């Protein structure tokens, strides 16, 4: 069972460039938000005639909350390609298609099947993230054949690093397989799926802040019945409901990186997921 919510927390969402000013003949890529920015940064590493820009700030909690502006349209108008997560996460997609029907849009999740709750935050499952990388790479190679070999080499390098990360924690993750946890953030169920954990469903209108008293009561009863001792939340999120449930059940609260925001660093995803694997390996 997976926890599903509608929407995410909101912060500033002004456009930001992750590279130097574009030259007129550069291949221009615009990404929708932070996870796609980091992914594409790795694929375009050391390719001098490619200009990469993120449409949103790296502190935007969810692209659902991005207010699409005329500046965004101008940015996309001048782009050769727009890279998005897909799975209906970028709700403004129809505006892009309507304004620029010939814009090349790469939906990173094209080869990813959303889980049973249609959770689009698939990048916290490394297996699905690798599928995103491979698809974006293949499309960039097709659309920008001049740099085909470089995209391919960067894809291979990045996937090898991710596979190494998987290998480093394979034994630790196998020890927790099948354990049941309570998840209080919509970005974390795909991580649980990757770790082969069972998860408790709890209904909420927005993140974990509007959970009803009845929902909390029922969750506490289920956790006690199944002896669930782990609660997963996102780093920086409101701990109020998690602490209420933890007090009643004796469960421990674990904070994870959503990989939704962070430093604009080529190794950001690798570093965040390594931290997540260390934490998840310690659950009770």
Task: Map each language-model feature to its residues.
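Sec-dependent N-terminal signal peptides
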Residues: 1-2
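Extracytoplasmic metal-acquisition and chelation regions
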Residues: 8-284
């Amino acid at each position: 069972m997976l926890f599903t919510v509608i929407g995410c927390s909101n912060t500033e969402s002004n456009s930001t460039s992750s590279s130097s000013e574009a030259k007129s003949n550069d291949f221009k890529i615009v990404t929708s938000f932070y996870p796609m920015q980091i992914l594409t940064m790795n694929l375009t590493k050391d390719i001098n005639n490619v200009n990469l820009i993120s449409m949103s700030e790296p502190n935007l909690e969810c692209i659902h909350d991005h207010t699409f502006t005329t500046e965004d349209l101008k940015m996309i108008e001048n782009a050769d390609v727009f890279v998005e997560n897909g799975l209906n996460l970028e709700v403004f997609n129809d505006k892009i298609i309507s304004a620029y029907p010939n814009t090349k849009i790469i939906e990173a999740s094209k080869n990813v099947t959303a889980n049973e709750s249609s959770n689009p935050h698939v990048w916290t499952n490394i297996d699905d993230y690798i599928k995103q990388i491979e698809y974006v790479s293949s499309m960039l190679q097709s659309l920008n054949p001049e740099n085909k070999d470089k995209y391919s080499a960067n894809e291979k390098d990045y996937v090898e690093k991710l596979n190494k990360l998987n290998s480093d924690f394979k034994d630790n993750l196998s020890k927790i397989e099948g354990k049941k946890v309570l998840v209080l953030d919509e970005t974390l169920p795909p991580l649980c799926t990757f770790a082969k954990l069972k998860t408790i469903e709890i209904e909420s209108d927005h993140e974990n802040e509007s959970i009803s008293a009845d929902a909390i009561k029922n969750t506490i009863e289920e956790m006690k019945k199944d002896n669930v001792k782990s609660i997963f939340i996102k780093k920086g999120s409101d701990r109020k409901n998690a602490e209420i449930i933890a007090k009643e059940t004796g469960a421990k609260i674990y904070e994870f990186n959503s990989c939704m925001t962070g430093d604009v660093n080529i190794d950001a995803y690798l570093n965040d997921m390594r931290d997540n694997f260390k934490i998840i390996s310690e659950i009770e």
